């Protein structure tokens, strides 16, 4: 972690840091100068540092460009929001030497991208990280443990068991809980905000995108049974956000009736409750195969480059002012 106090450091110092924290002296600088310094430091940061969170009091426009989630997050008022972050999978289809949530993605473990984003959102009351005890001492996790909002839970045999264990870790007065796969590190703050807003209004919401490919059904894996109507099909993502008690009741109902569920909102559907579809982003892919890792790196690099171009334009505008 690198701190700025007065004069900007050189480029190579910034590029050695994983994240950037600006500790400025407001009494000695005007708001305009603070904005210039923040923009300059953000520009010097590597393009992969997309989720760097500068702590600076500046204009809303500057804060948005700096991608400071705590500055722009707008979670529902009068709601206590928590996350259950599922990081207990083995990722066998990735064919790697370790679970996919610990694979390197542009110099950081996949799970680190998740945590940096979620812990930067001030409106989140608690984050329950569902992860095996053997991985909780990994070096990159140490810097997050000082945040009192982060607690741990043990994975279960199945996804449902892991979610239930995670639910046990949220506060009793939590009103909305988001279930999120650690293997989806590309989710954006905007998508999270919109899904929370829909869940607050409808009690259950899930990120989803319209299905692009033509989907055919087969009952034997050899011949086509029928072609499904693509206009009615949605590709479901995470986070999936619900009222905690609704989710608990859904699990009880599914267990009693021995119903198979494939995701979290399915248990709500089985009780006849409506689930709001929040239109997400196609870039919020789940890392499942080696090819997905390549795509994810490309997306992150593109985001970083676009961010730096926007920052450069903002900086030029500030420098032209008298």
Regions found by a protein language model. Give the residues of each.
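Conserved core of the sugar-phosphate nucleotidyltransferase
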Residues: 186-278, 318-322
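N-terminal chloroplast transit peptides
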Residues: 22-23, 31-58
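N-terminal mitochondrial targeting presequence
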Residues: 45-77
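Short, charged/polar "capping" segments at the starts of alpha-helices
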Residues: 134-140
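N-terminal glycine-rich phosphate-binding loop and ensuing alpha1 helix
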Residues: 75-134
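Short phosphate-binding loop-to-helix
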Residues: 143-176
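Left-handed beta-helix
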Residues: 294, 298-322
């Amino acid at each position: 972690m690198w701190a700025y106090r007065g004069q900007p450091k050189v480029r190579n110092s910034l590029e050695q840091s994983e994240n950037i924290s600006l500790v400025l002296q407001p009494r000695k600088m005007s708001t305009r100068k603070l904005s210039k310094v923040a923009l300059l430091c953000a520009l010097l940061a590597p393009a992969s540092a997309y989720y760097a969170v500068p702590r600076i009091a500046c204009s809303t426009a500057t804060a948005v460009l700096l991608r400071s989630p705590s500055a722009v997050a707008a979670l529902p008022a009068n709601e206590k929001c928590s996350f259950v972050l599922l990081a207990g999978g083995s990722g066998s289809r990735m064919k790697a030497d370790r679970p996919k949530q610990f694979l390197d993605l542009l110099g950081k473990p996949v799970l680190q991208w998740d945590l940096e984003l979620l812990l930067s959102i001030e409106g989140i009351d608690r984050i329950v990280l569902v992860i095996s005890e053997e991985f909780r001492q990994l070096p990159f996790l140490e810097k997050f443990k000082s945040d009192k909002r982060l607690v741990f839970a043990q994975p279960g045999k199945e996804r449902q068991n892991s979610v239930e264990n995670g639910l046990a870790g949220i506060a009793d007065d939590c009103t909305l809980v988001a279930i999120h796969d650690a293997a989806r590190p590309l989710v954006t703050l905007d998508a999270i905000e919109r899904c929370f807003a829909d869940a607050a209004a409808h009690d259950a919401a899930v990120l989803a995108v319209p299905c692009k490919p033509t989907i055919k059904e087969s009952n034997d894996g050899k011949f086509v049974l029928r072609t499904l109507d693509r206009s009615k099909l949605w590709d479901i993502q995470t986070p999936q956000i619900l009222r905690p008690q609704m989710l608990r009741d859904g699990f009880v109902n599914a267990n009693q009736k021995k119903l198979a569920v494939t995701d979290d909102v399915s248990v709500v559907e089985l009780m006849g409750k409506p689930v709001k579809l929040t239109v997400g982003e196609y870039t919020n892919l789940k890392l499942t195969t080696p090819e997905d890792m390549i795509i994810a790196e490309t997306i992150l690099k593109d985001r970083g480059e676009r961010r730096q171009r926007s920052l450069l334009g903002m900086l030029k505008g500030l420098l032209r002012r008298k």
